């Protein structure tokens, strides 16, 4: 989207940097956004084929159970699963009063054993991200989706780049 609007470069971390110079001696201004999102990393696959994971970013365990997730393998293949834990009917009365510890959760892929999960290309280190369809809610000006805070920053940086005409700055969209 920056092509033709700014000089584009890349850094060693994978950032895309657009530079638009109005006055080469003018002040430098940057609007930065980021496209990352919170998720998980595969740590192990159990003999039963369940995927154990560790968080990448901040998560609140109370909202995780029954959430659909996507594992992206190193080859780019996407495998869908759902977060599960010990069934409520086998929890002790004391366990039912507490949030489920994230370490007790797993991703259920609907496979019968570890071998089936491995055949799907899943291995430790693969990323796991929430599967959430981006949709408009009942009032169409309200949207549901994941990582909006991240993507809005990128959109703002691009919008400023689009709207910037004559200026005395060095503008960076990162």
Task: Name every feature range the model reports, one short phrase each.
Residues 1-174:
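N-terminal hydrophobic/helix-forming segments and targeting peptides
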